[in-house]
UniProtKB/Swiss-Prot annotation:
Keywords linked to the UniProt accession: DNA damage, DNA repair, Nucleus
Expressed in which tissues: Expressed in testis, uterus, bladder, spleen, ovaries, lung, brain and muscle (at protein level).
Protein name as annotated: Cell cycle checkpoint protein RAD1
Biological source species: Homo sapiens
InterPro entries tied to this protein: Cell_cycle_checkpoint_Rad1, DNA_clamp_sf, Rad1_Rec1_Rad17
Compartment list: Nucleus
Effect of F266A: Reduced binding to RHNO1
Length: 282
């Protein structure tokens, strides 16, 4: 990235965060997977960047971009946090077009000086450099879903194609998606209760799509479909998905996404259960 490197290398010390990518799509694609609200909170540490989006204190999405994804990654402080308009950020990241010509890459250098300063984006394609300044905001406290691995009751790992098919067939007239996880039959079941009646989709634990099955007790929980719907953006991009429920019925959907360079990033959705399940419908 010669132009960008020469232009700003000397100024690095004034920034609390500097991150460079040879291919901006390795960032923008992951951010699109959690873009269901306008604003996001960004957390940067030496391990990478976490971008968090929340809705109605019931659902939270986190995109993790590890430091190793970047060609250059520097964080001067222990942690750097700011809130940003995610819609504007994505518009800037695709300023040269969202689907460039084959073989053409847009390079990115992202710099943040600290509290009260804008996020600076330097984008370069074919020798042309565009500079964007995006105002940052006071970071709001994000929800702590307290989803601890020691409290996980049930966990399965599925190839994403199996869940993509299921989600495309869900009855969207149903307000809720009921998830049953059990050490015994039906093992893993997705149920909806729509205008046409109830429908169930079962996955045997020995299915070719099932990569891991660790269910300790039967759990039946309901989640608002409207809250789960945004997670299908991540599902479409992912190759595997880990589905976990804890002792409170909270749901974790962790999507493994491979970028254009074959590197792995993760997007995680947390969702709280909707209600107690009526005995007659379970």
């Amino acid at each position: 990235m010669p132009l960008l490197t020469q232009q700003i290398q000397d100024e690095d010390d004034q920034y609390s965060l500097v991150a460079s990518l040879d291919n901006v799509r390795n960032l923008s694609t992951i951010l699109k997977a959690i873009h269901f609200r306008e604003h996001a909170t960004c957390f940067a540490t030496k391990n990478g960047i976490k971008v968090t989006v929340e809705n109605a204190k019931c659902v939270q999405a986190n995109a993790f971009i590890q430091a190793g994804i970047f060609q250059e990654f520097k964080v001067q402080e222990e942690s750097v946090t700011f809130r940003i308009n995610l819609t504007v950020l994505l518009d800037c990241l695709s300023i040269f077009g969202s689907s460039p010509m084959p073989g053409t890459l847009t390079a990115l250098r992202m710099c943040y000086q600290g509290y009260g300063y804008p996020l600076m984006l330097f984008l370069e394609e074919g020798g042309v450099v565009t500079v964007c300044k995006i105002n940052t905001q006071e970071p709001e406290e994000t929800l702590d879903f307290d989803f601890c691995s020691t409290n996980v009751i049930n966990k399965i790992i599925l190839q994403s194609e199996g869940l993509r098919e299921a989600f495309s067939e869900l009855d969207m007239t149903s307000e809720v998606l009921q998830i049953t996880m059990s050490p015994d039959k039906p093992y893993f079941r997705l149920s909806t209760f729509g205008n046409a009646g109830s429908s169930h989709l079962d996955y045997p634990k020995d299915s070719d799509l099932m990569e891991a099955f660790h269910c300790n007790q039967t759990q039946v929980n309901r989640y608002k479909i409207s809250l789960l719907k945004p997670s299908t953006k991540a599902l479409v991009l992912s190759c595997k998905v880990s589905i976990r429920t804890d002792n409170r019925g909270f749901l974790s959907l962790q999507y493994m996404i491979r970028n254009e360079d074959g590197q792995i990033c993760f997007v995680e959705y947390y969702c709280c259960p909707d209600e107690e399940v009526p005995e007659s419908e379970s």
